[in-house]
Curated annotation (Swiss-Prot):
Pfam families: Pept_tRNA_hydro (PF01195)
Subunit structure: Monomer.
Reaction equation(s) it catalyzes: an N-acyl-L-alpha-aminoacyl-tRNA + H2O = an N-acyl-L-amino acid + a tRNA + H(+)
Broad enzyme group: hydrolase
Highest taxon of the lineage: Bacteria
Species of origin: Methylorubrum populi (strain ATCC BAA-705 / NCIMB 13946 / BJ001)
Function: Hydrolyzes ribosome-free peptidyl-tRNAs (with 1 or more amino acids incorporated), which drop off the ribosome during protein synthesis, or as a result of ribosome stalling. Catalyzes the release of premature peptidyl moieties from peptidyl-tRNA molecules trapped in stalled 50S ribosomal subunits, and thus maintains levels of free tRNAs and 50S ribosomes.
Gene3D superfamilies: Peptidyl-tRNA hydrolase
Name the record gives this protein: Peptidyl-tRNA hydrolase
Amino acid sequence: MRLIVGLGNPGQRYARNRHNIGFMAVDEIARVHRAAPFRRRFQGEAAEVMLGSERAILLKPQTFMNESGRSVGEAQRFFKIPLSDVIVLHDELDLAPAKLRVKLGGGNAGHNGLRSITALCGNDYRRVRLGIGHPGDKALVHAYVLNDFAKSEEPWVEDLCRATADHAPLLAAGEDASFQNKVHLAMAGRGWDAVKTPAEAGKAKARDAN
C-alpha cells in the first residue's frame, strides 16, 4: 500500500493558490482513477484508490501547511505504511513552471509542509516536486505562493495535474524514472517545455515593446 499525500491549505480561500498544487494533483488522481469519496480522517481528507495493481490512500491534510506532518503521521501509523512508501506531492519554487521531478529524501528547501513531515515522520519519503517557478526575489515568495495561479498559468497547471494523474500507476509501482519521463513527454507534447513565470513573461513583454 502507498500513502500519496498532496500538500496545501484547507478552504476555498486557498483552493487555487500556487501553494495548493499538491491538493490539485491529488484531486486529479482521484478523479482519473475513480477513487472512493474523500472522507474526513487523520486530520485530513482521505480516499482509497487503485493505481494499476497498487492500492493507495490519497491524503489531503487539513491542518494547514505548517502542521501537515501530524496528518501524515497519523495515517502512516494507522495503515503501518513504511516511510519509503509515502509519496508527497508539493509545490517547488526551485523548479521551472510546468516541470516535475521525483526524489527520495533530501532537504526541505524552506517548504514548511515538508519540514513538518520530516520532523514528525522522518526524511526518507519520496517527493514529487511540482514546479511553480520563483518570483525572483526572496521577499516576494510568501505572497507568490499564497496567491492564486494567474489565468495565463491555469492551462499548464491543469495539464501538469492531468499528466501526473494519468501516469500515477507508474509512481505507485516505484517506477519513478518512467513516471517522470512520461510526464515530461506529455507536457512537452502540449508545448509546455519552456514556461515562464508571470514576472518573467512581463519582463519579456517589456523587452519586446522596446
